[in-house]
Structures are given as structure tokens and as C-alpha cells.
Amino acid sequence: MTRGHKFTGRIVIVGAGPGDADLLTARASAALISADTVLHDADVSTAVVQRLTEARPDLELHPAVGDPAEVAKTAVTAAKAGRTVARLVAGDPFTNDAVVKEILAIARTVVPYDVIPGVAISTAVPAYAGVPLGSTHTAADLRSGISVAALVASPMPLVLQANGEIVADTARDLVEAGLPGSTHACVTVDGSLSSQFSLVGSLDEFAAGAWPSTRTGSVVITVGAEVDKRSRLSWWESRPLFGWRVLVPRTREQAGDMSERLRSYGAVPVEVPTIAVEPPRTPAQMDRAIRGLVTGRYGWIVFTSVNAVRAVREKFAELGLDARAFAGVKVACVGEMTAEAVRDFGITPELLPSGDQSSLGLLEDFPPYDDVLDPIDRVLLPRADIATETLTAGLQERGWEVDDVTAYRTVRAAPPPAAIREAIKGGGFDAVCFTSSSTVRNLVGIAGKPNSRTVVACIGPQTAATATEFGLRVDVRPETAGVLQLVDALAEHALA
């Protein structure tokens, strides 16, 4: 909407959807990322807020405080000061009575505003619970003060937003208003999140206290015969790792793909950094190696990790170089993620292991040095300071000279909070995913050994061997070493 006044600021009312950050619309995401200030409701999910802070660490996020008039005034004042204000609300803005009042208040001013619809809680949560609403249903928010008795004569099923504390009272009121006590209802908390919990029962059972008193907060109560179809349509909660708490001992930057894959299987990933990546203590060795690339010293460069690729890119930027420095140099990688990082650099790797994505797997495919076919007999191997000698020794056995260069250091991270340490040792995690020997050593060092009930998944043979050395039982190992393959193997294990 536009008005005949000139403002550099504006207000965008954005629907956040039911909770899952992936349900933000493309337009909503763009508006939030480009905003100067975000005013958000308390019931906007932590997942959505976290997605924002990761995308825009400098974004100002403030809770919306006060009644609709006060919240509208806060937004209008900021917009008149030239700021773009995103008013972030759970679900869809026009299905929230209080937010509608805010928008009406904003509309009475000269400040330009837009409304970006969100996925409505009243339709999304039943869908995530496996309850089909069909073409006709009745939705109401009991927190707005609507009479339960007035809803009984409305088209079924009923979809009621409420607080968990009043589930029993609501069921009792529905029966007293005329619905049979045998009518089925599904109560869902944390709808669309990996922590979603649903319980099906009759109104009589809920009236008698079937809903757990520990499950507080916002819930969606779906009432009617359609609830009976949940046993066949519960797609979200039937995923193989649904509800599993999985420990991911990696930095947040490295854990992104793994955590996303875990969520796709229904797990709740908990990222606990065990290592920090730092530059080498003396950069001279790395400087000489990079200059050697430019002068034609190397026939091959071998990358064994994303961190190694990142270290070389940073050194290139420091020295004013780009991908052209790789001219005439063949590139080998261990792991698809490492290869993808190289491709992002503008280079296509010549060699990846055809089998096991490990140093041993690469050695099986790496060609021996041939003084006729290979004009240069030297390989550059940029890697961590604590890497094993397996790859270097194997390349030398194949006739290559190897410059084994420390590209980065891995140092042990600070211990996690006490609650996390206790959960690790006490069985508070269903599984742990180890992606390197250093993550095993460092996790045990800073937090202790995982409980014997915890499923231990290791990315490859060397990592598994280290875990065994520390007295851990290795339950899962993918056929092909890789972060995503590791998660897939864990999901298969859960189904076995």
C-alpha cells in the first residue's frame, strides 16, 4: 500500500507460519532479511528467530510489548524515523485478532505498510499431525475469549488454538455444550517442529486430565471424526529419527548440512563445538606452498577437508591470487563436501575416491608417479596440524614427493554448559555423530564419554577406530564416508 507522503521507512507485517522456519515464504524471508528492525511476538518459534540471527547477525530484534495500540505506535515511530520495520507474528497476520487491531491502527497513520501472509497455524498444525480438515472446518482462538459453547453448532472439525493448561476445561466445556464425550480430539504442541507432540483421545479422556500437565504453552486442539485418520496419515511424527536428540560435535559453520539432514529425518540436532579452527602458528610454510602453486612446483594438490580448501582460499585472497593459480595443477579431494567447496572456488576436481571417502580410499585410486606421463613429481597436501601420516606415506610409496603443509590448526573448544555435559554422560542424547578422530578425542576430553545407551555413529574407519580406542561401541558406519551418508545410515539404523 502507498500513500501520498514521502517516507524512507515503512512497516511490513510478516506471517511467520506455525513454527518450522522452512515454512517462511520466500517473500517473508526477503522482507525480514532486508529490515532494519524486527518486532516479534513471544509465540514466534525459536527456530524462526534463530534463522534470522544466522542470516543477519546485525539485525535488531525486539519483542513486541504492550497492547495492539502500543505495538503499532512503536512500529510507526521507528518507520517515521526512516527505518524499515518488520512486524513478525506467528501464523498468518489476518487470522490474529490482536494483530488486525495493530494493522488498523497503522492504517490510520500516513506510514506505508505491507502485509505478507503466512501459513496459518489452524491449517498447518493439523496437517503436520496427520489430521485432514477437508474443505470445511471451523477455526477459533480460545485465547481471544470466544465461547466454546458457541462453536458446537459450527461445521466440524473444530480447530481450536489454546493454552495447554486449559485442555481439560475445553474438553469439558465442549461436552457440556452438547458434543458426545466419545468424540475424538487430537491435541498438538510445538506443531511443525521436530519437538512436536500429539495425543489423541476422547473428549471425556481429555476432560479427565489425559493431557500431560508438563505440556504447557500454545496447543492446537482438533476435534471431530477426521481425527480417526491420523493413524494412517501421521507423516511428520513417523519419520525414522523423529524426536531423537542427536549430538553433533562440530562448529555451527560446519554442522549446517548435517543438522539440516538430521531435521529432515525428524531429529533434534544439538550442536556442540569440540574444535576451533585457527591459522598455523607460522605462516611462512603456507606462503611458500601457495607461491609454489603459481611457479609450477606442484603436479597435484590434495584437499582432505573443507577447512583445507577454506585455508587455501583465504591465503589466495591475502596474496591477491585467484583460481587461475591452479593452472596446470591437478586437484584431488576426499569427500563430496570437500569437492563442492573446491567447485565453489571455480575448480573441477580431477579425482575423488571411487569407494571409501577417506585417505585410504583416495590412495586406492591415486595414480603412481610416472616420469614419462608426469612432468612434475611433487604433491601439495595442505591439512590440519594433527592429521595422520597415512596419506603422505601412501603417496610417497607411489613415487611422489609430498609437501605436507600445515594449512590450519585445530584446537580444543571450551567445555559445553554443565547441562549438556550431564546429558552426554547421563544418556540425554539418543545418538552422537562423529565426523573425525579429533571430534571423538575432543568431545571425550571436554565433556566425557557418551552414555552406553547412546547410539554412536562414525563417518569412516579411522574415526571408528578412535572411538573404539576410547571405549565406545560403534553402532553405525556408512558404506561411503560422508556427512550426509552418515546421517542416512543413522536413519536406516533407527528403522532396523
Task: Tell where the protein language model's regions lie, with residue ranges.
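Charge-patterned, long linear interaction tracts outside catalytic cores
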Residues: 159-160, 164-175, 181-183
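Class I S-adenosyl-L-methionine
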Residues: 1-116, 212, 219, 296-308, ...
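Active-site/ligand-binding-proximal alpha/beta "capping" segment
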Residues: 93-109, 148-154, 167-170, 418-426
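Conserved beta-alpha
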Residues: 45-46, 68, 115-126, 139-153, ...
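A short acidic, amphipathic alpha-helical/loop segment
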Residues: 27-28, 51, 74, 102, ...
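Short glycine/serine/threonine-rich phosphate/pyrophosphate-binding segments
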Residues: 21-24, 94-100, 119-125, 166-170, ...
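Structural motif
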Residues: 10-12, 36-37, 59-62, 83-87, ...
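Short Gly/Thr/Asp-enriched flexible loops that form oxyanion-binding sites at enzyme active sites
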Residues: 94-113, 127-130, 313-317, 444-447
